[in-house]
Amino acid sequence: MLTEVKNQLKVMFLSLKYNIMRQMTNKVTFITNIVFMILNNASFIVQWIILFSIKEEIGGFTIKEVILLWGIAASTYGIAHLLFYKAFDLSELIINGKLDTFLVQPKNVFLSVITSDTSISAIGDLIYGYICLIIYGITIKNFLLFTIFSITGAIIITSLTSILGSLSFWIVKSDILADSFTNAMLNFATYPGNIFKNSVKIILYTIIPVGIANYMPIDIILNFNFISFVYIIIFTIVITILAFFIFNKGLKRYSSSNLMSSRI
C-alpha cells in the first residue's frame, strides 16, 4: 500500500511539473500572473491596516494575527489550486462527459482528474502566504505548523469541493453548490473567527468547516494544543477518504452511461 501511495504522489508531482512547464512557455505572462496575485492579496491588508488604526483589536486579533490569518488563507487556497485545480471544475467535467480520457489511464482516476491542470496565479497566493508568515514572525515551530496547516487546509477545501462536485453524477446543478461553498470558505477564512457568534460559528465548524481549516490552525500556532492538532489531522484524513469514496461511487454511474442521461 505504501508503494502505491508513493507512486501516486510521484505521478501527482510529475503532473504538476509538466503543467507548470507548459504554462512557462510564455514567461512574461507566467511571472505577471504570480506578481499580480501577490499585489491583489496585499491590497486587502491595506483595509485592515486602516481598521486597526481606529481600533487596536478586532475579534481578539491584532493586526499581526490578522496578517497570519490571511497568510494561512492564501497558502491554503494556493496549494489547493496549484496541486488540485481541476477539483474546482469537477462538476463541469462530469456533466459534459469529459472523464473518458482519465478512465483509460493506469492510475487512480480521482487523483488523475483533480491534478490534471494547475493555476499559475496560485503560486502567487502561496508566496504571499509565506510573506505574511515572515511579517508575523517566522520561527522553526511557526514555519512547520504553518506549512502543515496550509497542506491540511488545502486538502480539506479540495475534498469538500470534490464531494460537492461529485454530486453531479446524480444532480445536474451541483456545480452551483460547489462554487458557493468555495466562495464561502474563502470569504470567511479572511475574518477573525471570534467575530462570529452562536449559530454562525457552529456552521463554520461543521457545514462550512473554515474553522477547522483556518481558525483552529491560527489558535494552535498562537498557543499550541496537541488535541486540536490531532483533531485537524484526523478530520483531514476522514474528509479525504469520503471524497474518494463518493467520487468512486459516482464513477460507477458515469461508467455505465457517459452521457449521464439518468441523472436527475
Which residue ranges define each predicted feature?
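Hydrophobic transmembrane alpha-helices and immediately adjacent juxtamembrane helices
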Residues: 1-136, 140, 144-264
